[in-house]
């Protein structure tokens, strides 16, 4: 698929579908498509859940209200099972992370050529529709979690307690301060990196498989592989949203523990 209508080779087709709609260059490059889709999906989440909350009834609930209540209950039970402190932010944060990431992941279930083709009709040459397959998005979300970890670590333990945790753990002796600081710093920094890269890697791989199926097989045979993979991928997109949420809760629970 190309804007001029010529037939692309498999290699060109794959490269085209992996190219973002971008502005800027170098370090300051911004992936417009990832930004737009993530904001739109986040807005959709807020609008939908607020609409259900406003129209919620104590009588016989509708299907949408039942679904939202199930999601609320699932996230709330997960938070209570992991986070044992008292913090009004954790449950709403966990709900936002789970639903938002799930919606971004679910974009991978759309037909691979549908939205990019509509974009080309509108003279938009490139379009990637899965925000969570963009490492900039996943690492940005993980960085937000990292700042919360630092904030609550300092708030609960104080600056002195936080520094002591970095310098006196795991070896509680002044002679091991450099080793402790190195180990704890690596551990602390690895949390957001692993959190973001795990989500990115799984979603990028899933997107790549759909692209490879579309690029390598004739259209009439793609369904034989696309449908089974899409069904299996539903589990992946849900599981990755759940893992990101759970690890966020675990990290914040550790940050809020007093020593």
Swiss-Prot record:
One of its GO terms (molecular function) is proton-transporting ATP synthase activity, rotational mechanism. GO terms for biological process: proton motive force-driven plasma membrane ATP synthesis. SUPFAM superfamilies: F1F0 ATP synthase subunit A. InterPro entries: ATP_syn_F0_a_bact/chloroplast, ATP_synth_F0_asu, ATP_synth_F0_asu_AS, F0_ATP_A_sf. Keywords: ATP synthesis, Cell inner membrane, Cell membrane, CF(0), Hydrogen ion transport, Ion transport, Membrane, Transmembrane, Transmembrane helix, Transport. It is a multi-pass membrane protein. The chain crosses the membrane at residues 29-49, 89-109, 132-154, 209-229, 230-250. One of its GO terms (cellular component) is proton-transporting ATP synthase complex. The keyword Membrane applies. PROSITE patterns: ATPASE_A. It comes from the Bacteria. It is found in: Cell inner membrane. Belongs to the ATPase A chain family. Key component of the proton channel; it plays a direct role in the translocation of protons across the membrane. F-type ATPases have 2 components, CF(1) - the catalytic core - and CF(0) - the membrane proton channel. CF(1) has five subunits: alpha(3), beta(3), gamma(1), delta(1), epsilon(1). CF(0) has three main subunits: a(1), b(2) and c(9-12). The alpha and beta chains form an alternating ring which encloses part of the gamma chain. CF(1) is attached to CF(0) by a central stalk formed by the gamma and epsilon chains, while a peripheral stalk is formed by the delta and b chains. This is ATP synthase subunit a. The lineage of its organism: Bacteria, Pseudomonadati, Pseudomonadota, Gammaproteobacteria, Aeromonadales.
């Amino acid at each position: 698929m190309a804007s001029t209508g010529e037939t692309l080779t498999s290699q060109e087709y794959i490269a085209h579908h992996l190219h973002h709609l971008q502005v800027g260059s170098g370090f300051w490059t911004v992936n417009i498509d990832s930004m737009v889709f993530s904001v739109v999906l986040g807005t959709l989440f807020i609008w939908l859940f607020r609409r259900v909350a406003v129209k919620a009834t104590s009588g016989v609930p509708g299907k949408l209200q039942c679904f939202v209540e199930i999601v609320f209950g699932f996230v709330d039970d997960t938070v209570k099972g992991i986070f044992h402190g008292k913090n009004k932010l954790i449950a709403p944060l966990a709900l936002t992370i789970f639903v938002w990431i799930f919606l971004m992941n679910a974009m991978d279930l759309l037909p691979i050529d549908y939205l990019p083709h509509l974009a080309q009709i509108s003279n938009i040459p490139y379009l990637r529709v899965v925000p969570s397959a963009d490492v900039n998005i996943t690492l940005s979300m993980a960085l937000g979690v990292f700042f919360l970890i630092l904030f609550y670590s300092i708030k609960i333990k104080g600056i002195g307690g936080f520094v002591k945790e970095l310098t006196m753990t795991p070896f509680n002796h002044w002679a091991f301060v450099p080793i402790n600081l190195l180990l704890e710093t690596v551990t602390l920094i690895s949390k957001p990196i692993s959190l973001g890269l795990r989500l990115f890697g799984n979603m990028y791989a899933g997107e790549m498989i759909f692209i490879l199926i579309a690029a390598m097989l004739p259209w009439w045979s793609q369904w034989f592989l696309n449908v089974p993979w899409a069904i299996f991928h539903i589990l992946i997109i849900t599981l990755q949203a759940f893992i990101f949420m759970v690890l966020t809760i675990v990290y914040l629970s550790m940050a809020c523990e007093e020593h």
